[in-house]
Amino acid sequence: TGLKGVKHGNRSVSSKSGSADLLEALNIPLADNPETVNAFLKEYGFVFLFAPFFHPAMKHVAPIRQSLGVRTVFNILGPLTNPAQPNFYLLGAYSSPMAKLMAEALSGMNIDRAFIVHGLNGWDEPTPVGEFELYDVKPNRVQHTVRDPKDFGIGRCTEDDLKGGDAKVNSTALINVFNQNDQGPHKDALV
């Protein structure tokens, strides 16, 4: 069964497909109220909190962010303002300075522990492409290390091996991993 997860996110702003886009392509409904959140969490052990439903002011900012097409301060604030106020966080950061900033911010929040990751290839997640930074955060303490997926038995791949696309392309790739039809880099990246 494992840990329950509450992901807080949005549609794509600076890429072709965001978390909400992927879930919609998979025909997974977005929870839009606290009752649905609790029901999904109880039944599935996971729920996605679509930011505009839970932070109404974000609806007014979304068109501006979309038109800019680049990362903004909201790429930092969004993950840190999860309405579920979890005790444990796992967050990806798009740059090394942002990973450090997020880790330092979380160390001053009411949390038990957090992990902030940044792929040294510039991605906001660890991948089989190469090494990644890991910030292990506890209240008033941040520990930084660099990890290599090879140390965990995961072989290398190229960025092209993990190249995504729009929500439909990405949802097909995810389904293939879940159905064990893809035993390559996508599966390794998901691990």
Please provide the spans of the model-predicted regions.
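A generic, well-ordered mixed alpha/beta core segment in the N-terminal half of proteins
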Residues: T1-F40
